[in-house]
């Protein structure tokens, strides 16, 4: 874990490599079969900016119905290979990359998802496959043989990477997410608060794991995801400081 100054420096360093101004023309997404890529913008903002944005968004966007109390807790266990490829490619600003994680919500085992997030420039594509609590425990114990012949292609590919590239757990990332949506979810704005790294374990169901904050005090990550184009009414309310645009990676921040 680094200091607040180190975290901020890392965010700005990565942001300079892959960031772009909102007004610039967006690159076309990769075309691979029927995969649906979404554009993703990230900002490092203050809680004061968030309060102002909430007021401006309220007449335009709706709270995501999945957030019963306005927000929910996300806990993700990130994996990386023997060479820490996902980490290194992110820091180096490699435009096309991927990472694996297992994600739960509000510390519950009701929904457990194995996810793979692929990124090409500023476009993202996410795949997921369901897991049971027992299957998660087996993965954590290194028993991944059951995934070799899974009905889910993502599980089979995870198995291959686990065996051939020594894919292993690296860090647990926690944060509180407040989600907003527009046009039935084609535009999604989220505020990720209290981003922290768990230490001393990889069991995502262990609520007693100690955690450490990774952002400087008073800061949070705002994400804007959309397909094809971003409506002008949303563009008009986005943070205006170009230097705040960043490719903040929670995995990189927490792994450090």
Regions found by a protein language model. Give the residues of each.
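Phosphate-end processing signature that detects enzymes handling 5′-triphosphorylated RNA
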Residues: 1-256
């Amino acid at each position: 874990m680094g200091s607040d100054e180190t975290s901020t420096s890392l965010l700005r360093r990565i942001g300079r490599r892959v960031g772009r101004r909102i007004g610039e023309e967006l690159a076309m997404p990769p075309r691979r079969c029927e995969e649906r890529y979404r554009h993703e913008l990230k900002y490092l903002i203050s809680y004061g900016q968030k309060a102002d944005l909430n007021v401006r968004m309220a007449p335009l966007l709706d709270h995501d119905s999945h957030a019963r109390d306005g927000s929910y807790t996300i806990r993700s266990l990130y994996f990386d290979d023997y060479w820490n490829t996902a980490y290194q490619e992110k820091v180096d600003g490699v435009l096309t990359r991927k990472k694996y994680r297992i994600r739960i919500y509000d510390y519950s085992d009701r929904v457990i998802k194995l996810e793979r997030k692929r990124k090409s420039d500023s476009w993202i594509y996410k795949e997921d496959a369901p897991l049971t609590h027992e299957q998660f425990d087996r993965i954590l114990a290194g028993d991944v043989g059951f995934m070799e012949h899974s009905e889910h292609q993502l599980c089979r590919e995870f198995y291959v990477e686990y065996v051939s590239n020594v894919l292993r757990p690296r860090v647990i990332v926690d944060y509180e997410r407040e989600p907003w949506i527009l046009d039935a979810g084609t535009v999604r704005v989220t505020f990720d608060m209290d981003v922290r790294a768990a230490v001393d374990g990889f069991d995502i169901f262990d609520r007693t794991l100690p955690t450490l904050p990774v952002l400087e005090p008073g800061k949070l990550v705002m994400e804007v995801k959309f397909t094809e184009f971003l409506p002008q009414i949303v563009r008009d309310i986005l943070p205006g400081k170009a230097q705040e645009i960043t490719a903040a990676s929670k995995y990189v921040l927490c792994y450090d």
